[in-house]
Amino acid sequence: MVATAEGEPGLTDALARLAGSGRADMPDLELLPGSYDLPGARLLDVVEVMDRIRLACPWSARRTHHDLVKYGVEEMYELVDAIEAGDRGELREELGDVLLQVVFHARIAQDDADEPFAIDDVAGTLVTKLVHRHPHVFGDDVAETAADVEAHWRRRKAEEKHERTSVTEGVPLGQPALALAAKLASRARAAGIAVRPEECGTGVGYRLLEMAVGAEADGVDPESALRAAAHVYRDAIRAAEG
């Protein structure tokens, strides 16, 4: 058995000596292709398949980043559903669909005439970010608790984003409203900035904003809390329908 990509020098040397001796017939050899793939090896297959699809599929060849936005949002919501349902098979499939969005966008970016980049650039940026934000894993810093890890993360992230002029920069405004409110509140609280929602305006929107800000301060994700409550509400409606 040849267990490595480099082969087995002992085996090949012995066969060479046997073949050159002229004193014995060579044994019959049967080639049985096999592989030992490292974790992540099939990601290379994903990249290769996506590349072929981009080149050969008329629909995929015409897609742009903007075209895929709605699909990316849908896939993330479907992933959330799979997680909350606890369905392992669905979770595996939906993770694959989210991965497709990443690979598809990277392949589209590769064709950009002005600022092209490829999947390796995406992965390289991610690796650099993860290593930099985990000095307790890849450096000499110490983190004995989850709070220590969060402190390292915030400090390193602040170093990376030192050019920002506001704590609100980088917060995606297109996310669901409750999640947006919670994220803004989290940024403000971390920076020691106190802005009360009722100081911003009146009406239903500001009352909802106040509740979201309060939930974030209490360590509750308002988006998840409302989604869970909405599920219960849905079940109650179904029960009332008889």
Swiss-Prot record:
Membrane-spanning ranges: none
Superkingdom, taxonomy of origin: Bacteria
Entry's Gene Ontology molecular function annotations: nucleoside triphosphate diphosphatase activity
Entries under InterPro entries matching the protein: MazG-like_dom, NTP-PPase_MazG-like_N, NTP_PyrPHydrolase_MazG
Disulfide bonds: none
Family: To E.coli MazG and to plasmid pIP1100 erythromycin esterase.
PANTHER family in alphabetical order: NUCLEOSIDE TRIPHOSPHATE PYROPHOSPHOHYDROLASE
The protein's name in its UniProt record: Uncharacterized 26.1 kDa protein in blaB 3'region
Organism lineage string: Bacteria, Bacillati, Actinomycetota, Actinomycetes, Kitasatosporales
